[in-house]
Amino acid sequence: MAVQQNKKSRSKRGMRRSHDALSTAQLSVDATSGELHLRHNVTADGYYRGKKVINK
């Protein structure tokens, strides 16, 4: 089992944790339906970049 040789300082611990923060989801409004969706993803009704790509 690995054990550290020296104690990590508060600064080094904080620098390591600086990448752990969560970011909010990037949402876009569809041009045709006006529906909110995740960026680079198909909307719930099957539109992507203004075109119907999924037929249900």
Curated annotation (Swiss-Prot):
One Pfam family matching this protein: Ribosomal_L32p
GO cellular component, one term: large ribosomal subunit
Any GO BP: translation
NCBIfam families, sorted: rpmF_bact
InterPro entries: Ribosomal_bL32, Ribosomal_bL32_bact, Ribosomal_zn-bd
Annotated region described as Disordered, given as residue ranges: 1-26
UniProt keyword list: Ribonucleoprotein, Ribosomal protein
Family: Belongs to the bacterial ribosomal protein bL32 family.
Top-level taxonomic group: Bacteria
This protein's name: Large ribosomal subunit protein bL32
Protein's UniProt keywords contain Transferase: no
PANTHER family assigned to the protein according to its UniProt record, in alphabetical order: 50S RIBOSOMAL PROTEIN L32 (PTHR35534), LARGE RIBOSOMAL SUBUNIT PROTEIN BL32 (PTHR35534:SF1)
Taxonomic classification: Bacteria, Pseudomonadati, Pseudomonadota, Gammaproteobacteria, Alteromonadales
